[in-house]
Amino acid sequence: MKLIKLIFFLSLFFQTISLADTNIEFENWKKNFKKIALKNNISESTFDLVMSNTKFLPNVIKYDRYQPEFYEDTKTYISKRTSDKKVKIGKQLYIDNLSLINSVENEFNIEKELLLSLMGIETNFGTYVGKMDILSSLATLSFDKRRSEFFTKELLILLNLIEKKQINYKTLYGSWAGAFGYFQFMPSTMKNYATDYDKNGSINLKSNPDAYASASNYLKKIGWKSN
């Protein structure tokens, strides 16, 4: 028993040291990344404001290494995400937002059934949009070597959107991979397809008007054809 306890505490000790070293490396990475950001039209004031509190998130690395969706066949994936209860919620959501959803459908020519189905699958109709700090998630994945180039680009795009005041950085909580809003847009998707449908001066993908219109605009632009 004493040996087991010793092994446990030694393991915990070395994990703590390892994380401390990683945090130091991450802070050094942030200093180097700041130079890249400034060269990509991010002001120093914006960078310091939104990146000063970003942290290395060990769980993000774990999630990136093991993504459950990749281990499920299509039938299993769909069966886990559809139910009579979910269909009922979707119908009620349509009734509650009848005018808006019909308006978006007419403007973008994207079926409301498709739109609501995607919303149900992605975030359970907006009830679970993720709680991760997207800036820290993207910074962690950019710092990590596995897919650094991809996530560095996504982080720079997000910083540019914040710089231009197109999105509010205080609302940026979502998935571990940096996806955001009712339809889980990555920053590059936000940049290319997000729409300020309610014309309030900023894009909020956690609001029904902007979320529905942005998802419909995305589907239209990538070539979806209604039946």
Where on the chain are the PLM-derived regions?
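Catalytic glycan-binding domains that act on GlcNAc-containing polysaccharides
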Residues: 41-227
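Cleaved targeting-peptide boundary
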Residues: 19-30
